[in-house]
């Protein structure tokens, strides 16, 4: 009888793999959104920089203001899209979790 008591231990409750697939944790969703927002802002800023340099060289005799203006437009657009992603469940570029 003592052998049966030792072998029969209560089952440990472990989360199944299916529950991890269906229900994502809040931190995972937030991390995914931050990754999208930061990469989006980096891409928009780089594109603004490129357009600013191109415009500066082509039209403005290599002055600095088109570059800064392009960077400003890129950061502003990235911020606006990031704000839309965080405010709504389906932003301009939503994260699929």
From Swiss-Prot:
Superkingdom as given in the UniProt entry: Eukaryota
Subcellular location: Mitochondrion inner membrane
Record has ATP-binding as a keyword: no
Disruption phenotype: Partially altered shape of the mitochondrial network with condensed, fragmented mitochondria accumulating at the periphery of cells. 60-70% of mitochondria exhibit an increased inner membrane surface and stacks of lamellar cristae disconnected from the inner boundary membrane.
Membrane topology of this protein: Single-pass membrane protein
Positions in the Mitochondrial matrix compartment: 1-35
UniProt keyword Membrane present: yes
Ranges of the Mitochondrial intermembrane topological domain: 59-97
Pfam families hit by this protein: DUF543
Stretches for region Disordered: 1-26
Transmembrane segments: 36-58
GO biological process: cristae formation; membrane organization
Keyword field: Membrane, Mitochondrion, Mitochondrion inner membrane, Transmembrane, Transmembrane helix
GO cellular component terms given for this protein: MICOS complex; mitochondrial crista junction; mitochondrial inner membrane; mitochondrion
Protein role: Component of the MICOS complex, a large protein complex of the mitochondrial inner membrane that plays crucial roles in the maintenance of crista junctions, inner membrane architecture, and formation of contact sites to the outer membrane.
Protein name in the entry: MICOS complex subunit MIC10
Annotated organism of origin: Saccharomyces cerevisiae (strain ATCC 204508 / S288c)
Lineage: Eukaryota, Fungi, Dikarya, Ascomycota, Saccharomycotina
């Amino acid at each position: 009888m003592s052998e049966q008591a030792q072998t029969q231990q209560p089952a440990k409750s472990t989360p199944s793999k299916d529950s991890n697939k269906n229900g994502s944790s809040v931190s995972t969703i937030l991390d995914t959104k931050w990754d999208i927002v930061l990469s989006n802002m980096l891409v928009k800023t780089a594109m603004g920089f490129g357009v600013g340099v191109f415009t500066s060289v082509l039209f403005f005799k290599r002055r600095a203001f088109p570059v800064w203006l392009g960077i400003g437009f890129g950061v502003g657009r990235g911020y606006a899209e990031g704000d839309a992603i965080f405010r709504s469940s389906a932003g301009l570029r939503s994260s699929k979790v």
